[in-house]
UniProtKB/Swiss-Prot annotation:
Tissues expressed in: Expressed by the venom gland.
Record's subcellular location: Secreted
Taxonomic source organism: Dinoponera quadriceps
One Gene Ontology cellular component annotation held by this UniProt entry: extracellular region
Keywords from the UniProt entry: Antimicrobial, Secreted, Selenocysteine
Protein name: U1-poneritoxin-Dq2b
Entry function: May have antimicrobial properties, like most ant linear peptides.
């Protein structure tokens, strides 16, 4: 999943 601040999990 992508979140802000940019994190790719």
């Amino acid at each position: 999943a992508h979140f802000l601040p940019p994190l790719u999990l």
